[in-house]
Amino acid sequence: LMGTPKELEFFLTHTLVKFGDKPLAICADHSGFDMKESIRSVLDNNNINYIDYGTFVNKDCDYNDYVAQAVGAVQRGDCDYIIASCRTGQGVNIAGNKFKGIRAAVVHDNYTAEYAVRHNCANFFSIPSKYVNKESFKQIFKTLQANTFDGGRHITRITKAENNESVRS
């Protein structure tokens, strides 16, 4: 293994992490509630532990409240990954990417799932409930599990993005 000490640390703390090493954090707003219930079912069927951060009822709510709780679990080290859902996936994605250390990606098919992991080392997967159903999520989840971060030129891109987290306008 070659690279800088920072690249080695990134490799050890992000690339070697696998689904199932720690519980997944899951969350949704009201528009993603049914999808979250499908996600729970898929995780249960695959014997994957998870912590559900809500919402727990299909009633109007703000995804920010649930995303913040799920992100807190990752930042504390309780969980390594988050799967979140809202109607388009964009809302939970934007909310997730506001937090330091979170690399959120909208995932709606196997291709976006594969490259969210391989090229972006995503740790937050935003699922659009309008376009993903339980059956397609099963395949997406298998794809997430089967892939790892490629490193190389992609770590440079991620490092540049992470450096932006400390920039003030």
Residue ranges and their predicted role:
Residues A25-I48:
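Glycine-rich phosphate/diphosphate-binding loop of Rossmann-like nucleotide-binding domains
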Residues N46, F99-K100, N120:
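Short, structured coil segments at secondary-structure junctions
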Residues L1-K18:
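Conserved alpha/beta core of the MobA/IspD/sugar-nucleotide pyrophosphorylase nucleotidyltransferase superfamily
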Residues Y50, I102-D109:
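Short hydrophobic/aromatic-enriched beta-strand-loop microsegments
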